[in-house]
């Protein structure tokens, strides 16, 4: 009987977890075909999955940008999972499904810029403040988040499209084992090739190396990586942190000694599981997340 009850509880928990991973709704990033669309398949239509909390006391939202080396979008472990983590803690979360190879720059970046503008314009609809919208990127998604943080603008007031009137600048960024640089000595070769092609334009390499574009106006950052990462070198994170320090941008940095690439939330990988506790504390200190109920 005890074994049966245990199995029943396990099955119920599995069903509940599956139910929680279904977004409340999905938004199209563009009203029609995306600029430069190569077809009409799902991969040609950028979308945003919406995860809303039961209550949002700090009126905060986060655009979650999964990784995948610009060749795929790791939408479960680096998309739905962190979105649920945020929603469970009273923060609205939005998972971006952006275009990847064969699409190249500027498509993935443009999709994220448009998503930020779209969400900021819908802040009241989703119960968050337009000045409390962050971006959380993993791996190549971290590169996109870092570009949003460094090359954003305040909107295009003259545009006939009202979505373009809003800023695409995140109010804070969370960078998890991110690609930061497109320079060959630091960057992730596959991400660079998928985004810029086999023979990248040096001007695009320079433009998309985020470490060279931070200013005092760049948003606060939380950066997490591991020293052992043999896919995206930890130097990427260190370059971004050093650039934040030079520019006077608030930054919190955690590098664990051991851990492979792509650990996502690392819930079952001690001591790496501590990184989300550190993130939670950082968000609470900055009033982007309410303190946990005692």
Where are these regions (language model features)?
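Active-site nucleophile elbow and catalytic-triad environment of alpha/beta-hydrolase enzymes
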Residues: 46, 159-163, 198-213, 218-219
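Catalytic nucleophile-loop/oxyanion-hole region of alpha/beta-hydrolase
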Residues: 74-76, 80-81, 94-130, 267-272
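A domain-start/cap signature at the N-terminus of enzymes
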Residues: 20-51, 190-191, 271, 275-277, ...
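Short beta-strand/loop motif that positions the catalytic acidic residue
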Residues: 223-225, 229
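C-terminal catalytic histidine-bearing segment of alpha/beta-hydrolase fold enzymes
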Residues: 51, 224, 234, 238-294
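Primarily recognizes the serine-hydrolase "nucleophile elbow" in alpha/beta-hydrolase
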Residues: 114-187, 191, 205
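Short beta-strand element of the alpha/beta-hydrolase
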Residues: 58-67
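Active-site glycine-rich loops that stabilize anionic/oxyanionic intermediates
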Residues: 66-71, 227
């Amino acid at each position: 009987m005890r074994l049966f009850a245990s199995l029943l509880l396990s099955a119920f928990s599995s069903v509940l977890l599956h139910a929680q991973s279904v977004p409340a709704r999905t938004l199209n990033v563009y009203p029609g075909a995306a600029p430069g669309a190569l077809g009409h398949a799902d991969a040609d239509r950028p979308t945003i999955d919406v995860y809303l909390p039961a209550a949002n006391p700090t009126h905060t939202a986060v655009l979650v940008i999964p990784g995948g080396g610009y060749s795929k979008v790791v939408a479960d472990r680096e998309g739905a999972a962190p979105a649920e983590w945020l929603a469970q803690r009273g923060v609205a979360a939005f998972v971006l499904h952006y275009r990847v190879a064969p699409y190249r720059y500027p498509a993935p970046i443009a999709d994220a810029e448009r998503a930020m503008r779209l969400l900021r314009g819908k802040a009241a609809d989703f119960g968050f403040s337009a000045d409390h919208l962050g971006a959380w990127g993993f791996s190549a998604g971290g590169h996109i988040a870092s570009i949003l943080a460094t090359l954003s603008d305040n909107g295009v007031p003259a545009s006939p499209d009202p979505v373009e009137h809003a800023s695409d600048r995140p109010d804070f960024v969370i960078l998890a084992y991110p690609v930061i640089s497109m320079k060959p000595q630091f960057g992730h070769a596959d991400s660079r090739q998928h985004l810029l092609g086999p023979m990248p334009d040096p001007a695009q390499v320079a433009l998309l190396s985020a470490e060279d574009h931070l200013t005092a106006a760049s948003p606060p950052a939380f950066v997490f990586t591991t020293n052992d990462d043999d896919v995206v070198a930890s130097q990427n994170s260190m370059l971004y942190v050093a650039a934040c320090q030079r520019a006077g941008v608030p930054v919190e940095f955690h590098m664990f000694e051991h851990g492979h690439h792509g650990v996502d939330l690392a819930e079952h990988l001690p001591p790496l599981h501590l990184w989300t506790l550190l993130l939670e504390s950082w968000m609470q200190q900055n009033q982007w997340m309410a303190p946990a109920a005692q």
